[in-house]
Amino acid sequence: MTKIYNLAILPGDGIGPELLQKDLNFKVLKEQYKLKINTTEYDIGGIAIDKYGKALPKETLDGCKESDSILFGSVGGPKWQHLPPDQQPERAALLPIRKYFNLFSNLRPAKLYSTLNHLSPLRRDISEKGFDILCVRELTGGIYFGKPKGYIKNIIDKKAFDTEIYYASEIKRIAHIGFKLAQNRKYKITSVDKANVLESSVLWRETVNTISKEYPDVKLSHLYIDHAAMQIIKNPDKFDVILTSNLFGDILSDECAMITGSIGMLPSASLNDSNFGLYEPAGGSAPDIAGKNIANPIAQILSIAMLVRYTMKLPMISDHIESAVIDTLKKGYRTLDIANDKEKYVSTNDIGDIISDILKKRI
């Protein structure tokens, strides 16, 4: 019997709705690849605050529970920045979903395409070497979720505090993910910590070293976070899989994204043990360009490719989607964010249609 995939679609705010409108609409996957896909749309983020008074309504969470995975757009914008931090869309919508579904593994690929080499802020002699980095970030532990935390204002010298806590079991499970991914790439993994200062990083390094013995074919190296940040700028081509904690991964994955030249090209997947995932573009809601039909949908489309690879377990189809994106770029099609002064750019809708047409021809 053909598997039926039920997907929760969460467009959110800003450019999210228009990008998910051009997400191939799953039409190609349904018609050309004969996949059985049901999609249901739910409100999240600022638009949900306006309608329901909260960023993550019960109806949305219940819908996600009934789904095989989530395709997410973006949340947030100036309209809701006056709210207390724990009620703002970015924090009140995403963090509870990550915690509820135990989405402990965040995968953020950062690839510099040869056709877009000129966009990288790196020196030309560095960018010309290219790079293809996969950041594997532990997503549900560490300082973002550690207790106690607080902000004490009713004293002369105000103070605030957060707690970085990791259990060995949390480190083990993300380490296994990282090593297995490295086995499907270049058999090389770099673990990033601050073991010269932080006790949590001492445990991190000890645990990763222990897990590495189960993967003798993968070469493991360690870097401190400050040195890793420097080396990503200096020698990005030397990296393959980067394995790191929640806080450090938050920083390094954005650094890797920006040296590609456009965050609008980069997808993201957050997964649990059962292949349930939240798939989203790495960029934000970009309210300044929302509704103008100029946003880059490629990150959203590549997020679908990740969904097909990791939840549906159909790597060949995922490869086809990624190849269609590469061919589109080789043919010279660009959205505004990746076009230079001499190139004519196409709209959000147009580039989505072009990628779909190329994908159809691959079958």
Curated annotation (Swiss-Prot):
List ligand-binding residues for Mg(2+): D226, D250, D254
Which chemical reaction does it catalyze?
(2R,3S)-3-isopropylmalate + NAD(+) = 4-methyl-2-oxopentanoate + CO2 + NADH
* SMART domains linked: Iso_dh (SM01329)
For binding NAD(+), which residues are annotated in this chain's numbering? 77-90, 284-296
Q: Which PROSITE patterns match?
A: IDH_IMDH
Enzyme Commission number: 1.1.1.85
- GO molecular function term, any single one: 3-isopropylmalate dehydrogenase activity
Keyword Acyltransferase in record: no
Keywords associated with the record: Amino-acid biosynthesis, Branched-chain amino acid biosynthesis, Cytoplasm, Leucine biosynthesis, Magnesium, Manganese, Metal-binding, NAD, Oxidoreductase
Residues carrying the site annotation Important for catalysis: Y144, K194
Which residues are recorded as binding substrate? R98, R108, R137, D226
Gene Ontology CC terms, in alphabetical order: cytosol
Does 4Fe-4S show up as a keyword for this record? no
Q: What family is it from?
A: Belongs to the isocitrate and isopropylmalate dehydrogenases family. LeuB type 1 subfamily.
The UniProt entry, under NCBIfam families, shows:
leuB
Q: Per its record, how is this protein called by name?
A: 3-isopropylmalate dehydrogenase
Species this chain originates from: Buchnera aphidicola subsp. Pemphigus spyrothecae
